[in-house]
Amino acid sequence: SEWDVKNWTMDELKAHVGFMKDFNVQLKSEGVLVGAEGLAPPGQARIVRAGKKDGAPEVTDGPFAESKEFLAGYWIIHVDSPEQAYAIAARASIAPGPGGKPLYIPIEVREVASAPPVEP
């Protein structure tokens, strides 16, 4: 699959990572980047919850094996409109994959939630 980076050549991987680094520099120069990180592969994920008896961490492997989609990274941007966020997401979507061809990555766009006002 074009999404399985284990099958990419080193040059393809370098081109992809280079694209993402350059993209982050562009967002920073545009004054919209709040934060961005790539994440480790899903095989390194762990699911943690508090133990019911003593609250100690209970750690299991995750995510679930049947999951085919996963979060590879994220950006937090500060923009004036949803349309501006969509345009930025479309730019990220064309990151190169195998053979240098655009991947057309599906980018999920969500607003950062605001907490309801708390009365003193």
Cite the ranges covered by each PLM segment.
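Conserved, structured core segments of small domains
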Residues: S1-P120
